[in-house]
C-alpha cells in the first residue's frame, strides 16, 4: 500500500518539465488525500483539516518554486507538508540564542574557542564521508520538540566515540532535554552549552536507560555511559579550513538556517540563505564534489524518511544556510 501511495504522490501527479518537477496545483485535494493516508494523518475537525489543506497547498507552491529555481536539488512532499513554515520551524528545530535556563550554573570554564580561518597547510582528500568510515550512528527523529541542539550534541559524541573505539553507542537525547541545567529542553538551546552541561553533570546516559519520548520531562539520575574531557566551540570563517577540521576531528555540530530546506528531498541544495536567522542544529559528516559542484554532507534529526535517508547536502564555498558562524562545536573525549 505504501509503495502504491508513493507512486501516486511522486509520479502520477507530477508534471516533468525540462528543468524541474512541478505539481499540478489543480490536483491539490487528491494529493492531500493521498498525503494524509501515506503519513497516517488524522484531523480532529473539518476546520483543522481545512487549515492543514491550505498549508499543504502553500507548500506545494513552495515546492514548485524551489524546483524551478534550484539547479542541483529536488524538493518534494514530506511528512511535514501540512504545517506552515513558522509552525514547522517552531516545532522541529530548536537552536535558540539567549535562552539560558539557569545563568548562575553557566561558567564556560571547560570550553575552548577556536577560530577556523587560515588556509589548510596539508593537501586534503577531495571527498570525505564519515558514514563510510563507521563514524556516524543512525539517523534519529526529534519529533515535535525543539531539541535539535541535544540531537546534534549527542550525534557528535556518538560519532567521536565510534571513530575512537570502533564501537557504536546509542546515547540519550532525552536525558539532556530533561537534565541540562543551561538549555531549555524542548524550548531550545545551544550545542556548546549542552557540552558544558555534560561536563558539569559528569557524563552522558545511554538511550536504553532513558529512551526518547519527545517532550520535557523530569530529570532522573541514571548511570553514565561515558564522560567527556572537554569541549570546543568553533568560529567558522574559512570553508577550506573547515574541511581540514572535519578530516582531523571527525563529525562536528553546526548551526544553520534550515528554512529553505523544509521540503528538501535530494541533491545539492544550491539555494539556502540565512534570511530567517540561525534556527537549527545538525551534524556535519562529510564533503564531496559532484559534476564540479562542491558540497557538504549533513545529518539531520527529522527521521530517515526526510531528505536523503535523513541526510542532506548543501553547496560548499558559499556559506550555505549561514553555516559559517560562531556556534559550531565538538566534544573532546
Curated annotation (Swiss-Prot):
Disulfide bond annotation, renumbered to this chain: 145-186, 179-219, 272-321
Biological process, per Gene Ontology: proteolysis
EC number: 3.4.22.50
First-tier enzyme category under EC: hydrolase
Key words, A-Z: Disulfide bond, Glycoprotein, Hydrolase, Protease, Signal, Thiol protease, Zymogen
Propeptide: 21-124
Reaction(s) catalysed (UniProt annotation): Endopeptidase of broad specificity, hydrolyzing substrates of both cathepsin L and cathepsin B
Glycosylation sites: 170
Active-site positions on this chain: 148, 280, 300
Post-translational modification: Synthesized as an inactive proenzyme and activated by proteolytic removal of the inhibitory propeptide.
Stretch forming the signal peptide: 1-20
Family: Belongs to the peptidase C1 family.
Functional note: Cysteine protease that plays an essential role in host liquefaction to facilitate horizontal transmission of the virus. May participate in the degradation of foreign protein expressed by the baculovirus system.
Protein's name in the database: Viral cathepsin
Amino acid at each position: 500500500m505504501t509503495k502504491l501511495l508513493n507512486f501516486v504522490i511522486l509520479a502520477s501527479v507530477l508534471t516533468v518539465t525540462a528543468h524541474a518537477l512541478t505539481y499540478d496545483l489543480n490536483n491539490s485535494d487528491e494529493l492531500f488525500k493521498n498525503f494524509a493516508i501515506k503519513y497516517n494523518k488524522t484531523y480532529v475537525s473539518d476546520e483543522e483539516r481545512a487549515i492543514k489543506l491550505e498549508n499543504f497547498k502553500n507548500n506545494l507552491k513552495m515546492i514548485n518554486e524551489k524546483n524551478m529555481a534550484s539547479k542541483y536539488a529536488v524538493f518534494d512532499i514530506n511528512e511535514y507538508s501540512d504545517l506552515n513554515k513558522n509552525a514547522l520551524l517552531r516545532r522541529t528545530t530548536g537552536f535558540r540564542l539567549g535562552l539560558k535556563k539557569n545563568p548562575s550554573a553557566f561558567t564556560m570554564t571547560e570550553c575552548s574557542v577556536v577560530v577556523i580561518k587560515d588556509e589548510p597547510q596539508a593537501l586534503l582528500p577531495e571527498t570525505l564521508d564519515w558514514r563510510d568510515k563507521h563514524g556516524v550512528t543512525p539517523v534519529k527523529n526529534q519529533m515535535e520538540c525543539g531539541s535539535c541542539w541535544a540531537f546534534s550534541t549527542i550525534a557528535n559524541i556518538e560519532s567521536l566515540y565510534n571513530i575512537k573505539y570502533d564501537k557504536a553507542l546509542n546515547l540519550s537525547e532525552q536525558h539532556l532535554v530533561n537534565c541540562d541545567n543551561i538549555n531549555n529542553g524542548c524550548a531550545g538551546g545551544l550545542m556548546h552549552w549542552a557540552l558544558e552541561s555534560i561536563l558539569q553533570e559528569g557524563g552522558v546516559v545511554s538511550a536504553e536507560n532513558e529512551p526518547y519520548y519527545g517532550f520535557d520531562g523530569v530529570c532522573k539520575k541514571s548511570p553514565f555511559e561515558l564522560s567527556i574531557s572537554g569541549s570546543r566551540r568553533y568560529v567558522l570563517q574559512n570553508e577550506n579550513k573547515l574541511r581540514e577540521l572535519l578530516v582531523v576531528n571527525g563529525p562536528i555540530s553546526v548551526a544553520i538556517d534550515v528554512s529553505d530546506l523544509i521540503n528538501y528531498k535530494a541533491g545539492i541544495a544550491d539555494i539556502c540563505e540565512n534570511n530567517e536567522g540561525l534556527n537549527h542544529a545538525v551534524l556535519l559528516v562529510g564533503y564531496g564534489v559532484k559534476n564540479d559542484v562542491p558540497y557538504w554532507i549533513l545529518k539531520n534529526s527529522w527521521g530517515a524518511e526526510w531528505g536523503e535517508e535523513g541526510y542532506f547536502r548543501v553547496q560548499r564555498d558559499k556559506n550555505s544556510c549561514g553555516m559559517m558562524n560562531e556556534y559550531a562545536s565538538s566534544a573532546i573525549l
